[in-house]
């Protein structure tokens, strides 16, 4: 009803997301994915007419200002499912017409012996 009447007042998160210059998200790897609250956030920002829309030919129309989304993930063990995590986030970028998607991860942080600081610094140098 709100969208049908062009009333987007209930979609503040989506409006904010659509208007930022660059997006950086850092989250732990939990249960083969990201935290559930981050999933809820993604669901709240996927709003037709704010963060994406289709033209009369079914082609996506760019609505999000950002040109880059960077996702940083850490994990205590191996990231055995990183391909599906990457794929989901890449598809969000495609939906939002964000042309550049950077995906950085550091895994095995709970495996000893392990110099966590050195591994994090090495990953940060890739930015």
Region locations from a protein language model:
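Charged, glycine/proline-rich intrinsically disordered loops and linkers
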Residues: 1-3
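Glycine-rich phosphate/pyrophosphate-binding loop and the adjoining helix
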Residues: 83-127
């Amino acid at each position: 009803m709100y969208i049908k009447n062009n009333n987007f007042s209930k979609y503040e998160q989506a409006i904010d997301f659509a208007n930022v210059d660059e997006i950086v998200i850092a989250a732990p790897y939990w249960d083969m994915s990201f935290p559930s609250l981050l999933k809820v956030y993604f669901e709240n920002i996927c709003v037709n007419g704010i963060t994406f829309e289709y033209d009369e030919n079914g082609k996506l129309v760019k609505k999000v200002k950002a040109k880059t989304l960077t996702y940083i993930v850490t994990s205590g063990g191996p990231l055995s499912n990183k391909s599906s995590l990457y794929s989901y986030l890449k598809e969000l970028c495609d939906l939002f017409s964000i042309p550049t998607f950077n995906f950085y991860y550091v895994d095995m942080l709970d495996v000893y012996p392990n110099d966590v600081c050195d591994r994090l610094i090495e990953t940060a140098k890739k930015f």
